[in-house]
Design a protein with these regions (language model features):
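Dinucleotide-binding Rossmann-like beta1-alpha1 core, especially the glycine-rich loop
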Residues: 1-71
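Eukaryotic N-terminal low-complexity, Ser/Thr- and Lys/Arg-rich leader segments
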Residues: 49-52, 63-77, 87, 91, ...
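General small-molecule cofactor/ligand-binding pocket signal
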Residues: 13-15, 170-172, 322, 346
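Mid-domain catalytic core of redox enzymes
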Residues: 178-316
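Short, well-ordered alpha-helix to beta-strand connector turns
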Residues: 166, 208-209, 342
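Active-site/ligand-binding neighborhood in enzyme catalytic cores
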Residues: 59-192, 197-199
């Protein structure tokens, strides 16, 4: 993502330090101070030096993970998530089979640290518990212990500019409803894509050599796609995506509801069954921080009822809720997601079964681009060899 931002000439969004607290439904169990040194002292008082030891361990995992950039620079490609993880570290695929709780317990960390700090990162980032597989757990921890950044004007500017600045890309705003595998001259696979444009029910058709899917393949997705003519027409995952509700509220926060004396910028939950919400945070402009913003973003696993919102806020002016299937329901049940579904049919979102994040999507997208490029040119070169060979055989006869 950093390379994309630099390539496109975009800017990092300025941010100010935000104070964060962890809430268990009864009380605030940890609250950051305005002074960093006091926050460290509070952290050590409650958890000892284990948080810092865990950050070092997560850093070692990130260092191994970063090998993927060198591999992709050298044109390495991967057809499934296990081979991608294996290329970074032989131990990484095993992390998909162990829960983050059992993995961290085996490393010698306390239940208290796991049930409060580790669980908080998972609740906030994925709306899930410590029974998720270890790799996504470490990705979640990486997001908590390292400097994160965003793009000025909104992170969506990265894909928008990558698409619209490329004059060779033709964007067709439409919904794809069906993909049919057809054979051309009995040898070459082509894909017939059926779609209808926005605000229209007329079915359109187009044929492509390569099709890349950048959507979750689940049975209950909002805009389902059917597949026909493939050896196996069911490319859908047996697992599910986690449904998350984002609620935006323009109002004044009631600190006492959370056991606070004054407002904080972020309130994170370590027990969503008791807190109802996963997190609550002050929402700033995508152009930069707004002083004293009274717009709040709340994540929860269920829609918030108006009485709950009124208990948390006063002077409520506006409420907006958005529900979406945000990321997979992670577990230790092995799901061998594939980047290559058929000869020239590819799936970017396979990488989400490792972990869902913008950087992961960028890596998955690049892998599929490299994979499609390699496959196409292998086929193209092979066809050229066949044509040249046939021509050489015919030449003597024609002479």
């Amino acid at each position: 993502m950093r390379d994309f931002v630099e390539l496109l000439g975009l800017e990092h969004r300025p941010s100010k330090g935000k104070r964060t607290s962890i809430w268990n439904g009864n009380e605030i169990i940890f609250e950051e101070s305005n002074w960093e040194i006091l926050s460290f002292i509070k952290l050590i008082y409650r958890y000892g030096v284990q948080p810092f030891s865990l950050i070092r361990y997560v850093t070692s995992i990130i260092n191994n993970f970063e090998k993927i950039y060198h591999l992709q620079d050298n044109g390495e490609v991967f057809t499934n998530i296990s081979s991608l993880l294996l290329s970074m570290n032989p131990e990484f695929p095993k992390l998909l089979e162990k829960s983050i709780k059992s993995e961290i317990l085996n490393l010698g960390y306390s239940e208290k640290l796991i049930n409060e700090l580790v669980k908080t990162t998972l609740v906030v980032n994925y709306g899930q518990d410590t029974n998720v597989h270890s790799f996504v757990g470490f990705v979640s921890l990486a997001g908590a212990g390292f400097n994160l950044w965003s793009v000025k004007g909104g992170n969506k500017k990265v894909p928008e500019h990558l698409i619209y600045r490329n004059k060779h890309v033709n964007v067709v705003p439409s919904h794809v409803i069906k993909i049919i595998n057809i054979l051309n001259n009995g040898t070459q696979n082509l894909y017939e894509v059926h779609y209808h444009n926005q605000d229209s029910t007329n079915i359109m058709k187009a044929t492509y050599d390569i099709v890349i899917l950048a959507i979750p393949l689940i049975h209950n997705q909002e805009f389902p796609i059917t597949f026909e003519g493939f050896p196996n027409n069911d490319f859908f995952s047996p697992a599910k995506y986690h449904e998350t509700i984002a609620t935006f509220v323009k109002a004044d926060l009631k600190p006492h509801y959370f056991g606070l004396e004054a407002e904080l910028d972020n309130i994170l939950s370590c027990d969503p069954n008791r807190t109802i919400i996963s997190s609550l945070g002050r929402l700033n402009s995508v152009e930069g921080s707004m002083k004293n913003s009274n717009v709040w973003k709340i994540f929860s696993n269920k829609p918030l009822k108006s009485n709950i919102i009124n208990e948390m806020f006063s002077n409520v002016q506006e409420i907006k809720q958005i529900t979406w299937k945000a990321y997979p329901e992670y577990s230790t049940k092995i799901h061998e997601a594939k980047f290559k579904l058929h000869n020239a049919l590819y799936h970017v979102n396979a990488i989400e079964w490792i972990a869902s994040a913008m950087e992961m999507s960028a890596i998955g997208g690049r892998n599929v681009a490299l994979l499609a490029h390699r496959d196409f040119f292998r086929k193209f070169c092979f066809e050229k060899i066949i044509q040249t060979s046939s021509l050489k055989k015919k030449l003597p006869t024609e002479l």
